[in-house]
Amino acid sequence: MESISWNTPSVRDALAAVKRDAPFIYGLTNYVAANLSANVLLAVGAAPAIGAAADWPARFGAGANALWINTAALMSSGADTLLTAARAASKAGTRWVLDPVALGAGAPEYDAIVRDLLALRPTVIRGNASELIALAGGTAAGKGVDTTASPESALAFIGDLARRSGAVVSVSGPTDYVTDGVATLAVAGGDARLTRVTGAGCALGALIAALLAQRGAALAAASAAHAIYATAAERAADARGTASFAVRFVDELSLLDPAESSRDRSAGQIGAKRRE
């Protein structure tokens, strides 16, 4: 299995393209995650719009450079809003990310909406191990929005899900894995305090969308997003507490320079890590 990091040239090239092109990214998420998601996108040079005002789902779902749907948006928006955006994206050929938050945690009606979204063929599906095992048809109930399974236990499930759905699938944990059902890439590193920052996983989905907007291979885009995220978290590791870490993390995202010389701080050298 190949590993990638910030020192992988394609990762730096992907970030450089976002900074150059400032893609317009439309997102549907909940009020808990919206602020961090927008700030992550702004930090890397993308232009975000988040929310379901007026005709945004239909207009921006089709017109944005990429879309991401975090199903926690159902806290404040109806299922029709999410489905409208996904249908518009699919019809227009807009690439989009599905983040099935808390799938399998015990709400059948909610799970049914997620599966309706899956039928609209997202480009990338991003989640934690419990969510993705459940989406693939396995049994792994999470603890609310948090996982009770390891990424390694999800590998067979995410490979099967990728092959059946046609999407690239990425799972987060101490080591992240990204697969198209044929090739699987590993991204280690990050910082465990990302699990203590509300919306950190949701914001990763937003970052994946920003890199997808460049229209390169979806596997490369998604894995690059994971590597960029891990690197910023590592560089924020000397923050004193959780709140200062969250601020420093966004700072470090904004300071990542694709042209910098190689450092001995790549995603893959610090073993602690991260998120739901």
Swiss-Prot record:
Signal peptide feature range: none
Binding site for substrate: 199
InterPro entries the UniProt entry points to: Hyethyz_kinase, Ribokinase-like
Protein EC: 2.7.1.50
Domain of life from the UniProt record: Bacteria
Single GO MF descriptor: magnesium ion binding
Cofactor(s) demanded: Mg(2+)
Catalytic reactions of this protein: 5-(2-hydroxyethyl)-4-methylthiazole + ATP = 4-methyl-5-(2-phosphooxyethyl)-thiazole + ADP + H(+)
Residues given in the record as ATP binding sites: 126, 172
Pathway of action: Cofactor biosynthesis; thiamine diphosphate biosynthesis; 4-methyl-5-(2-phosphoethyl)-thiazole from 5-(2-hydroxyethyl)-4-methylthiazole: step 1/1
GO biological process assignments: thiamine biosynthetic process; thiamine diphosphate biosynthetic process
SUPFAM superfamilies: Ribokinase-like
Keywords, sorted A to Z: ATP-binding, Kinase, Magnesium, Metal-binding, Nucleotide-binding, Thiamine biosynthesis, Transferase
HAMAP family per the UniProt record, alphabetical: Thz_kinase
UniProt function note: Catalyzes the phosphorylation of the hydroxyl group of 4-methyl-5-beta-hydroxyethylthiazole (THZ).
Similarity comment: Belongs to the Thz kinase family.
The protein, known as: Hydroxyethylthiazole kinase
Organism: Burkholderia pseudomallei (strain 1710b)
Gene that encodes the chain: thiM
